[in-house]
């Protein structure tokens, strides 16, 4: 690993508000064919009000340093902590952005990876809310499909903090931005630990790895046990 470097962003966003406490934790980026990087980031507009705004920043990379070039639409909610921990995916020529919020996760899409439609609440294809809240979601693109990795309410999991287990995967309809309920599967079963903080590694067009560390064992029946780190390998026939 090389030395730690900082990405310099403008002092103000498009609305004229200051850009404060920028970070890109828990995000998925998209690397473009020309070497540019589409990096989702979040920031505060007010140091006294911890309400996040999320953007996608286009950056260049020269092999050592990441340099900001531009960013697109700015997305937030007025309540609580706003929209944060954004993750980006490219699928069939469009870009899809999922964002964490305290009450309900949100989703949007756009053509260029920078500018997006107004966000909407994540829902199943029957119109009911997905029930994912106050933790991150991530994308998987494999086998010609677009999938979401998430946790949610309503899975006999009221004993789990913020309903952060089990860890699910389901296919997304890219036209409606809804999760197809019949495709939902459990990636990692609930075992008295939280599973909300997962990661996705796209190995190839036909293989993706999901990693997830258990958390908060002290709150459940496995108190004083050692937590586990789970690895799930997803493959497709092409």
Locate each region found by the language model.
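Active-site-adjacent segment of 2-oxoglutarate/Fe(II) JmjC oxygenases
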Residues: 139-142, 146
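Beta-propeller and closely related beta-sheet repeat lectin domains
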Residues: 25-28, 84-87, 135-138, 194-199
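Beta-rich carbohydrate-recognition and catalytic domains
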Residues: 1-22, 30-85, 89-131, 145, ...
């Amino acid at each position: 690993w090389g030395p730690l470097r900082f990405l310099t962003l403008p002092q103000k966003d498009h609305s004229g508000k200051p850009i404060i406490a920028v970070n890109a934790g828990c995000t998925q980026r998209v690397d473009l064919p020309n070497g540019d990087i589409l990096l989702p980031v979040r920031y505060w507009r007010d140091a006294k009000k911890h309400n996040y705004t999320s953007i996608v920043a286009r950056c260049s990379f020269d092999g050592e340093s990441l340099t900001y070039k531009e960013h697109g639409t700015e997305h937030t909610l007025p309540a609580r902590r706003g929209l944060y921990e954004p993750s980006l995916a490219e699928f069939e020529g469009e870009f899809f952005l999922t964002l964490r919020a305290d009450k309900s996760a949100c989703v949007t899409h756009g053509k260029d990876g920078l500018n997006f439609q107004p966000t909407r609440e994540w829902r199943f294809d029957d119109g009911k809310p997905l029930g994912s809240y106050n933790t991150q979601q991530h994308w998987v693109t494999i086998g010609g499909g677009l999938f979401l990795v998430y946790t949610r309410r309503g899975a006999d999991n009221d004993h789990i903090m913020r309903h952060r287990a089990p860890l699910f995967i389901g296919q997304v309809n890219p036209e409606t931005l809804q999760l197809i309920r019949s495709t939902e599967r459990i990636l990692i079963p609930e075992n008295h630990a939280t599973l909300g903080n997962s990661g996705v590694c796209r190995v190839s067009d036909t293989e993706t790895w999901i990693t997830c560390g258990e958390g908060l064992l002290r709150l459940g029946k496995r108190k004083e046990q050692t937590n586990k780190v789970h690895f799930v390998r997803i493959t497709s026939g092409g």
